[in-house]
Design a protein with these regions (language model features):
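Extended, highly charged
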Residues: 1-279, 284-294, 298-617
């Protein structure tokens, strides 16, 4: 069903039993976020908050809380969207299948944005920032934030929608040093289109005009986070997914979405920053306070009976998890088509997305040789780390399509449950085991030091700075993985647990990376090749890590800075290449420079428990 507004979507969800109305007045300070999290964790419906303390406007969240609900919302337009993306990725297919192409033409007409000729913000009233639902999500947050903002900017050299960018960059509405109703904070990370626009404006010494849209058809929200093929703008995509052309106009030189519920316009002046944050973010930790651009508010608009759309982020999975699932469902092979030889890629949500990337490539360089070792997948890995958002990956595990012969399988894999063909990257535990069976730790580890990394990742040396590790393995199985603790590990006199075959967590209470490295010196090859121990994790709580595979994934890959926190048993450097003969040792302890993990406010939790009882949660 095509929706012209956020309210139309919510009413349709209600008709189909997918909406919960909270009729009591709720506090935007922590309480609304806690309600959202409780209902999300229960796989509950979308939520409409009818009375928000301190604001006359309603608010909605958990709209995209499950993949099933997201697919329901776009049930009538998803096929056409996927078809158009396929045509954009592979124009030859359009020639080969002309009937399919013709059927996509009506949807393509919705891709053309529609400018309102009156040049007025139709049906809007002018309000202040203080009139909005000022929702603070977590106790240590610096203030209230917009968490589903559609931030629109244009290229100052080529103004107009044709060279615009629409992205989702959080907005801080109050707190810190911001002057209420006059200033808001604009936080954006590396590899974002808005950065290109601000750089150009700065070079000319001119302010960058910014428009922030909130609400409107749900298709607009999805468009802001889509990795789109070259030449397809977010507004094109929004129109096709909504089955309604993206409506806009200009007010005082600022672009205004005529379908949005709220619009905030303002300017970012060169060199004008203010402290932004902290904010409890999607890695499960607070992103700390740092200088980011301050936006001078020009005007704030709201439609009559507008609905404030928001989400709550934290340690995965959260509502943004289903965003990722929906994106994968829509785009399919878009990314792998962009990188020659790449077959599959998966940013692991449980690790916070950017910290852990899994990929399957191809090995076609030397098919005439029996020697099987990484070659083409190293080229593919470099391409991945030079491509858009994929370049923010901290750990990249990459292998190639299976090549093991039946004879090899019979020799190497008898009595072993590990897959002999490469599992899908979406089967994370199986994929890691497949690689750990094949990895040559003296050859297959490639560190990238002193490089950029995700703004939200505090495992590195400084903001936006750290290291990366490419683990590239290809070939036959080299070893079986340990499923019980070897004597060499139990003799360390430290609490130890098997996390998964080949991976062991050891308590940091009595041991460190270096103490273990010293105690196991000279025993590395036996421990790795005969005992099957591939990775030793040092952590404060190995029992907790062993409880749940996702605990291991989250704690390890968010807390480890590869160049600083990884050592190996019997390690060395040859021709500037680091490797080891024994297991890798990861220091996954919490360090002093790490950002704190988010914790719940128990008083608020009690109130939420009482409130939600009557709603069955």
């Amino acid at each position: 069903m095509a929706y012209s507004s956020m309210e139309a979507c919510l009413l349709d969800l209600e008709r189909n039993g997918m909406l919960l109305r909270i009729k009591e007045e709720v506090d935007p300070y922590l309480e609304m976020a806690a309600i959202h999290l409780r209902i999300f964790e229960s796989k509950g419906p979308a939520i409409l908050f009818e009375k928000v303390k301190g604001s006359k406007y309603r608010a909605a969240s958990n709209i995209f809380g499950t993949l099933e609900r997201s697919e329901f919302i776009f049930r009538d337009t998803l096929p056409a969207v996927k078809q158009l993306i396929d045509i954009k990725i592979n124009p030859l297919a359009a020639i080969q299948h002309p009937l399919k192409t013709l059927s996509a033409l009506p949807a393509a007409l919705h891709a053309i944005p529609c400018k309102n000729p009156i040049n007025q913000p139709v049906l809007f009233e002018e309000i202040n920032i203080s009139d909005l639902p000022l929702i603070q999500h977590h106790p240590m947050d610096g203030g209230a934030f917009v968490t589903l903002p559609l931030v629109y900017t244009e290229d100052i050299d080529k103004p107009g929608m044709g060279n615009s960018n629409l992205g989702m960059y959080r907005i801080q509405l109050n707190g810190n040093d911001y002057i209420l109703n006059k200033e808001v904070g604009l936080h954006y990370q590396l590899h974002r289109g808005i950065g290109v626009h601000q750089t150009k404006a700065n070079h000319k010494g001119l302010p960058l005009k910014v428009s922030c849209f909130i609400g409107g058809p749900p298709a607009h929200t999805v468009a802001a986070v889509m990795p789109l093929p070259e030449g397809m703008s977010e507004m094109n995509f929004a129109g096709v997914l909504a089955a309604k052309r993206f409506g806009y106009t200009y007010v005082d030189g600022f672009c205004v979405s005529t379908d949005a519920d709220f619009v905030i316009t303002g300017e970012v002046f060169p060199g004008e920053n203010k402290p932004e944050g902290p904010f409890g973010d999607h890695l499960g930790y607070y992103s700390l306070q740092h200088p980011f651009p301050v936006m001078k508010v020009h005007k704030v608009f709201a439609k009559k009976n507008a609905i404030w759309a928001f989400t709550v982020v934290g340690r995965p999975p959260q509502e943004d998890t289903s965003f990722g699932q929906l994106i994968h469902h829509i785009t399919g092979a878009a990314v792998s088509n962009e990188i020659p030889g790449l077959k599959e890629v998966h940013a692991v949500d449980a690790a916070g997305v950017h910290p852990l990337l899994l990929a399957i490539g191809s090995e076609r360089y030397t098919p005439y040789l029996d020697n099987k070792k990484p070659a083409e997948i190293l080229t593919i890995a470099n391409h991945i780390l030079g491509t858009g958002q994929l370049s923010l990956a901290k750990f990249l595990w990459i292998t190639a399509e299976s090549i093991t012969s039946q004879k090899d399988n019979a020799t190497l894999v008898s009595n072993n449950s590990v897959a002999t063909t490469v599992p899908s990257v979406h089967k994370v535990d199986e994929f890691l085991q497949y690689m750990l069976c094949r990895m040559d730790f003296s050859n297959d580890l490639h560190f990238h030091t002193k490089t950029t990394m995700d703004t939200l990742d505090y495992s590195g040396d400084d903001l936006n700075s750290g290291s990366k590790l490419v683990l590239a393995a290809y070939g036959n199985q080299r070893r079986k993985l340990a499923t019980i603790l070897p004597e060499k590990i139990t003799s360390l006199n430290a609490q130890a647990h098997i996390i998964m075959p080949g991976v062991i967590a050891i308590s940091a209470e009595k041991e460190t990376v270096y103490s273990i490295q010293e105690k196991l010196k000279g025993q590395g090859e036996d421990l790795l090749e005969k005992q099957g121990v591939t990775i030793i994790i040092i952590t404060e709580n190995p029992a907790w890590m062993a409880e749940d595979f996702n605990n291991f994934i989250w704690a390890t890959f968010t807390r480890v800075n590869p160049a600083n926190d990884i050592e190996g048993v019997d390690s060395g450097i040859e021709n500037k290449h680091w490797g080891c003969k024994g297991p890798l040792i990861f220091d996954a302890t919490i360090k002093k420079h790490h950002a704190p993990a988010m914790e719940k406010n128990m008083e608020v939790e009690k109130r939420v428990t009482s409130l939600l009882k009557k709603y069955g949660f």
